[in-house]
């Protein structure tokens, strides 16, 4: 299903380039595999459930046909995401989340009920230490920040971006709407402080 192989981060291969998956007419929950590629995530017992809940909420609120789709989320560490970031973005440093949209074949004209394979949306990688550090530095709950990053990564897989101010505003509005549906405060405001 995934470009991320279960096991060590050395088993990860990178993204396929040139995604053209864009918004379609309806949404449904994609099959989502969560791969724990770094032991540090095991201290967060609810991390997998948090990610799955965020992906489900995002899929339910965006205008993209994801019901027959598959994606993988790799929960890695700073070393793992740093290697991916260096290899695919030329930035030799850790980051919080990376998304690797898969290229999409043209399914138009495929007969209903045919043997057309599910769409691979792509892969998301999330780094534990960076997520933990950002949540602590910003006074946010870890699960809220993890949810935000899973939603952010998913939105990239279905065609959202933030290269321009207008794109960023659209993407942030979608993130706020999805997270509000999960009872999570606006991640761009100061209201999610841990007391």
UniProtKB/Swiss-Prot annotation:
Residue sites binding Zn(2+) per the record: 152, 156, 162
Keywords from the named record: Cytoplasm, Endonuclease, Hydrolase, Metal-binding, Nuclease, Ribosome biogenesis, rRNA processing, Zinc
Keyword Metal-binding tagged: yes
Compartments it resides in: Cytoplasm
Cofactor(s) needed: Zn(2+)
Free-text remark on how the cofactor is bound: Binds 1 zinc ion.
Molecular function per GO: metalloendopeptidase activity; RNA endonuclease activity; zinc ion binding
GO cellular component, one term: cytoplasm
Top-level taxon of origin: Bacteria
Gene Ontology biological process terms in this record: rRNA processing
Record keyword Hydrolase present: yes
Similarity comment text for this entry: Belongs to the endoribonuclease YbeY family.
Function: Single strand-specific metallo-endoribonuclease involved in late-stage 70S ribosome quality control and in maturation of the 3' terminus of the 16S rRNA.
NCBIfam families (alphabetical): rRNA maturation RNase YbeY
Protein name in the entry: Endoribonuclease YbeY
Organism: Rhodopseudomonas palustris (strain HaA2)
UniProt gene name: ybeY
